[in-house]
């Protein structure tokens, strides 16, 4: 028994002294492996008398249990120490700016950045975001928006139509995000305050037009909404988006089937050697269209125009992105040129706020 106690003490000391998992495994094999010291003692039980086997067997198994428990406890300690050392070696400060690397790094596309900027600005004014399908019905895209039969936008050369259904109805790629406004008015009761960003499609392609582009439209429906509210919202948006403290705006009469009166908005700017500066100068630049929602549109969406009125506006996201960040050709936004994106794109984590731009 004294030999067993000495062996147990020796093994436990070796376990405590093991400095890593490899050394601990060597101790385990030497003690509990097929040819281990404790395993050898267990093999001698068959040669003992029943009384000896009962006494010695209990003692050897007790020693084996103590060694097994000590191995498990030491293994947990070593694993925890190894993890702590690894974490200490791999610690990084995630608040530090990204380091320049010869390897290519991904960039945030200017359209994604601008989408974040404008949704954040309007969210601060209390607007929610509404979305809808790219493939729309003629009814939602045109009829409920007061487009009369024979309107040029309903012709094949302006709109991507699908083949007619057996009943003669046609599906199409939406030409604006206004159908989202229709869907919102049909499913929500006033007051309504939403913006509708998304992809739109028209048959057009040149330096300032592409068959697929992005729009954001806004809609407010309430009992007391008026053009003064619309003017304030657009004025505050332009100041925040173009990062100026003051900007003059000019509202010009226009015509859209879904608004009455209809207006187009110009903003003050100065052109200097190919650069556009907003909030100063004597030039004017058209930026969006807007107006009071036509009573026919309200009726088509189940809203009583004698009780409620509202206003709406729409602008091209691609266009305002080009104006803010100095891009000259709209088509480059969709070409997937990595060199172009490395110049105009944004490095992750380098834009301090969603509403921030180049000046930040």
Curated annotation (Swiss-Prot):
Q: Do you know which InterPro entries this protein is assigned to?
A: aa-tRNA-synth_II, aa-tRNA-synth_II/BPL/LPL, Phe-tRNA-synth_IIc_asu, Phe-tRNA_ligase_II_N, Phe_tRNA_ligase_alpha1_bac, Phenylalanyl-tRNA_Synthase, tRNA-bd_arm
Q: Where in the cell is it found?
A: Cytoplasm
- Annotated EC: 6.1.1.20
Q: Which Pfam families match?
A: Phe_tRNA-synt_N, tRNA-synt_2d
Q: Which CDD domains match?
A: PheRS_alpha_core
Q: Which GO terms describe its cellular component?
A: cytoplasm
Enzyme class, spelled out? ligase
Extract the GO molecular function terms from the UniProt entry. ATP binding; magnesium ion binding; phenylalanine-tRNA ligase activity; tRNA binding
Please write the reaction equations for the catalytic activity of this protein.
tRNA(Phe) + L-phenylalanine + ATP = L-phenylalanyl-tRNA(Phe) + AMP + diphosphate + H(+)
One of the GO biological process terms:
phenylalanyl-tRNA aminoacylation
Report the principal subcellular site.
cytoplasm
Q: Provide the residue positions that the database annotates as binding Mg(2+).
A: 260
> NAD: is it a keyword of this entry?
no
Q: How is the cofactor bound?
A: Binds 2 magnesium ions per tetramer.
Q: Which UniProt keywords apply?
A: Aminoacyl-tRNA synthetase, ATP-binding, Cytoplasm, Ligase, Magnesium, Metal-binding, Nucleotide-binding, Protein biosynthesis
Which metal ions or organic cofactors does this protein require, according to UniProt?
Mg(2+)
State the family it belongs to: Belongs to the class-II aminoacyl-tRNA synthetase family. Phe-tRNA synthetase alpha subunit type 1 subfamily.
* Subunit structure comment from the entry: Tetramer of two alpha and two beta subunits.
Question: What's this protein's name?
Answer: Phenylalanine--tRNA ligase alpha subunit
């Amino acid at each position: 028994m004294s030999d067993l106690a000495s062996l147990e003490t020796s093994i436990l000391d070796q376990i405590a002294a093991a400095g890593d998992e490899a050394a601990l495994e060597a101790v385990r094999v030497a003690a509990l492996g097929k040819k281990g010291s404790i395993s050898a003692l267990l093999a001698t039980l068959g040669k003992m008398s029943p009384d000896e086997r009962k006494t010695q067997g209990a003692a050897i198994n007790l020693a084996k249990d103590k060694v097994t428990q000590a191995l498990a406890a030491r293994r947990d300690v070593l694993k925890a120490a190894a993890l702590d050392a690894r974490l200490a070696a791999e610690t990084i400060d995630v608040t530090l700016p990204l380091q320049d690397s010869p390897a290519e790094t991904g960039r945030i596309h200017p359209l994604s950045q601008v989408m974040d900027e404008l949704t954040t600005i309007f969210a601060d004014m209390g607007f929610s975001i509404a979305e809808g399908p790219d493939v729309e019905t003629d009814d939602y895209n045109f009829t409920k928006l007061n487009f009369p039969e024979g309107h040029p936008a309903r012709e094949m050369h302006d709109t991507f139509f699908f083949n007619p259904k057996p009943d003669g109805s046609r599906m199409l790629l939406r030409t604006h995000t206004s159908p989202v406004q229709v869907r919102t008015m049909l499913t929500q009761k006033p007051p309504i305050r939403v913006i509708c960003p998304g992809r739109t499609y028209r048959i057009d392609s040149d330096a300032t037009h592409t068959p697929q582009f992005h729009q954001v439209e806004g809609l407010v429906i309430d009992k007391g909404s008026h053009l003064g509210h619309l003017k304030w919202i657009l004025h505050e948006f332009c100041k925040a988006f173009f990062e100026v403290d003051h900007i003059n705006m000019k509202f010009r009469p226009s015509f859209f089937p879904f608004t009455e009166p209809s207006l187009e908005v110009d903003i003050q700017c100065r052109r200097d050697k190919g650069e556009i500066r907003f909030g100063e100068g004597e030039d004017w630049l058209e930026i969006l269209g807007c107006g009071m929602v036509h009573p026919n549109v309200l009726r088509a969406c189940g809203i009583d125009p004698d009780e409620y009125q509202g206003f709406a506006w729409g602008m091209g996201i691609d266009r305002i992105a080009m104006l803010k960040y100095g891009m000259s050709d709209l088509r480059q936004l969709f070409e997937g040129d990595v060199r172009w994106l490395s110049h105009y794109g944004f490095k992750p984590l380098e834009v301090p706020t969603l509403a921030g731009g180049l000046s930040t």
